[in-house]
Amino acid sequence: MTDAYPPAFGLRTRWCGELRPSYAGEEVALCGWVARRREHGEHLAFMDLRDRTGVVQCVIDGSVDVRSEWVVRVTGTVRRRPEGTENPSLATGEAEVADCQVEVLARAEPPPFPLDERTETDETIRLRHRYVDLRRDRMQRNLRARATANAALRRSMEEQGFVEVETPLLMASTPEGARDFVVPSRLHPGRFYALPQSPQLFKQLCMVGGVDRYYQIARCVRDEDLRGNRQFEFTQLDLEASFAGQEDIIEVLTTAVRACAAKLAPSREPGDFPRMTWYDAMERYGSDKPDVRFGLELVELSELFAESGFNAFRGQCVKGIRVPGGAGLSRKRLDELTDQAKLWGAKGLVWMRVQTEALDSPVAKFLSEEELAGVRSQLEAEVGDLLLLVADKRTVVRHVLGLLRLELARPPVSEGGLQFLWIVDFPLFEDIDEDGRPVPAHHPFTMPHPDDLKLLESGSPEDLLGVRSQAYDLVLNGWELGSGSVRIVQPEIQRTVLRLVGIDEATMQQRFGFLL
């Protein structure tokens, strides 16, 4: 992000955040909000003035009546602060504005919460007074970062030959992954428009219309359950390209995201964008959006315990993780982790402390010497480590250990650099329902992997669950940034998939005839 300041308009000649000792002697006019006022004797006061660029100290007459969050215009002379009064926590901390004349532009009631970054305020209160919350430095930085990201993405997409096309906001309802928000039609009572969950059909029409390479910073709306990282409205970089495959789109997006990262975080330049299959991600990290900034990978132990005398392990999927130096965790903490694992769906959690000669564990007496030695060897355990094992169905084991590794070791988002990762080869179907039909992992319009078309034609449940799709996700430090897929363009394959999920020919023609 750039530190350059735009030209000042009208009532101001400078921005608060740009003043430095090099401006000493310059007559300036500033506009902003009163952040704080401090009395300094009977006839002198210091006022911190804030605008979107930062805060600067102004020296004012003690008789001037200004209060927190009043909007004012200040004229005065920039000077270097006296030695010993500098404020190193401010970018402007070596300068101040003296001999100030203050013009009150707007008075204000006391703010509903403090605006300094040191004070945590309940989010409900912040949202109720969002216009005040937006004045905080963090929110201003977020808005500028968002604008910088959008500009970088636009520039990169245009350099790669894509054309920005705005698509309609009012459309007919189409099958998507969530419920629609609807808008009643004034001209057609009883009928409704839907707000777009994505511009999918419109961008496909752009391809039919010869646009060839389309993109849009698109506003999307989905009526789904709210979470910390999921809201009704969101913005996405949406794109489509004709005569392109998965590798082409991944390359385009890698270029665009790299350009965006260079503008937002030039000191944290990302390295490679490695690939990992969905299966490997689930087996090694227990998640399809793994945080690869740290280890604690899941290790397969099922074969070791296939014929175990310990009933909880025998014949189950068994995996473990090694926590370096974790043997020092208290019994209370281990009990907390066990309870957490049960809440996540496990029957229990086996822990083992690695000692010089043996493994200290409540279940050690139920395991053979060969099994204990095998655990130690396969997990590459060292003295002082903690080993955590879960035995259950494979889906449960992966899920629980995947969450445990995050619970134990996930670093803050700001640490460890930018670790981008492409997840590829998602399954086309995630399960078989009670009627024996496959359940699409995403939607029934994703192109199967070309090497798995024979499995699709077989129709057996085992084969269908082995079909990979041409779907892909981009992950950053354990968070899904976005996803995409190659759509089915051959009517025969589309018919096959729709038939497999239980849609008859008449319904196909009625709902999806334009695709067939």
What residue ranges belong to the model's regions?
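Class II aminoacyl-tRNA synthetase catalytic cores and aaRS-like
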Residues: 1-516
